[in-house]
Amino acid sequence: MSVLKEYRTVSEVVGPLMIVDQVAGVHYNELVDITLHNGERRKGQVLEVQGDKAMVQLFEGSTGINLAKTKVRFTGHSLELAVSEDMVGRIFDGMGQPIDGGPELIPEKYLDIDGQAINPVARDYPDEFIQTGISAIDHLNTLVRGQKLPVFSGSGLPHNELAAQIARQATVLNSDDNFAVVFAAMGITFEEAEFFMNDLRETGAIDRSVLFINLANDPAIERIATPRIALTTAEYLAYEKGMHVLVIMTDMTNYCEALREVSAARREVPGRRGYPGYLYTNLSTLYERAGRLIGKKGSVTQIPILTMPEDDITHPIPDLTGYITEGQIILSQELYKNGFRPPINVLPSLSRLKDKGSGEGKTRQDHAATMNQLFAAYAQGKQAKELAVVLGESALSETDKLYVAFTNRFEEEYINQGFYTNRSIEESLDLGWELLSILPRTELKRIKDDMLDRYLPKADTTMTKVFVAND
């Protein structure tokens, strides 16, 4: 057994970073034990090694460090997480330490939080439907097991409520397999942390969840570790315990801000908007940990949530996230101001794998056809409403007025389901058919006649007028 060497050669401390001189045999990502002059112990991780100098990032901050009296010991291994199936139903801090007052966990093993690279050949194709209970996602932007589908939010929008709703309601249909939610909250306030903990406890969703909470006043370095710790937990539950795991990570913008803070402390050359040039690579090490493996029963599905600075979808964080992931769910300021909850803007939203998780045997045979028809009708109705604003309602044809009526009801009944309504996919499909019945059958050109005969409700012959709601 090798003896760990202790160093007292700390030469500099800058923000969350510490420089240790005259080191030997130190490796990148190695875990570091730090003992202060008063006996307090802290943890760190090697960020960079140049010659006999090691740059260490501190997990608990640098306050109170005395350069001459601080002892540093390199452990010889990277940061590891003690994992156990008993983690389900528990609440942890951003570094994986229990904070719920529950019993001490007995680790089944220790896993590197950076995970293992997945051979692309070993990946299985995502093709099983996950029901979130939200019509705008399940019906129009279907989430598939093993997919990574981000939510693009904006300042002041209720993405926390949406995240909690998905955590409560998500399930895999037609399966007896265990389902779990791993929830990673990064850089949130005390109020937001209380909301998530209370919501999951009161609804009973905590019984199938693992919650990691990194607060806004916690060190930035911890914020960088939190999603990796959450994903390590998810991979353990999925690939070693055979569970289907949904990982919800919010807010990825706070994570990227922590990366920028550490990069600035390292005096690295900044990239776009001051973020490090390796932001894309760094995000991919998180997002690419979603998926299914051939021969493994479990799966890891991701819903990362981010706040777009100034609602700018071209900002580096949503821009790079969109390149790596398989679609996006976009929340709308306009829908939110009009009182619609959740304010999901379905037209620019997209799930690139939605066709793989829908259809007979997975949802229902009319899923794809009604999805396409709803998209087309809603887009045409929005155009008709814009035309009415410019030219007046008198300029609209009778068909245009029907499209406007459809659009109003679509937003009020379909999108605006609230944060505590859990709709099955059958209920979403049936509601879609009910709304499509507002339009003449001749306008439903994206649905085959035999499907119209089977599912389309009979028109209400007593309706002689269509009233167009004024915005």
Swiss-Prot record:
Q: Which CDD domains match?
A: ATP-synt_V_A-type_beta_C, ATP-synt_V_A-type_beta_N, V_A-ATPase_B
The protein's matches in Pfam families, at most eight in alphabetical order, are given as:
ATP-synt_ab, ATP-synt_ab_N, ATP-synt_VA_C
> What keywords is this UniProt entry annotated with?
ATP synthesis, Hydrogen ion transport, Ion transport, Transport
Q: Which molecular-function annotations from GO does this UniProt entry contain?
A: ATP binding; proton-transporting ATP synthase activity, rotational mechanism
- Coiled-coil regions listed: none
Please verify whether the record's keywords include Transport: yes
Which biological process, per GO, is one annotated for this protein?
proton motive force-driven plasma membrane ATP synthesis
- Check the record and name the Gene3D superfamilies matching this protein: 3.40.50.12240
Q: Which InterPro entries match?
A: ATP-synt_VA_C, ATPase_a/bsu_AS, ATPase_F1/V1/A1_a/bsu_N, ATPase_F1/V1/A1_a/bsu_nucl-bd, P-loop_NTPase, V-ATPase_su_B/beta
Q: Does the keyword Translocase belong to this entry?
A: no
- Physiological role: Produces ATP from ADP in the presence of a proton gradient across the membrane. The V-type beta chain is a regulatory subunit.
Q: Give the family this protein belongs to, as stated in its UniProt record.
A: Belongs to the ATPase alpha/beta chains family.
Family matches, as PANTHER family: V-TYPE PROTON ATPASE SUBUNIT B
- The name on file for this protein is V-type ATP synthase beta chain
Species this protein is from: Streptococcus pyogenes serotype M49 (strain NZ131)
The lineage, from the top, is: Bacteria, Bacillati, Bacillota, Bacilli, Lactobacillales
Q: Which gene encodes it?
A: atpB
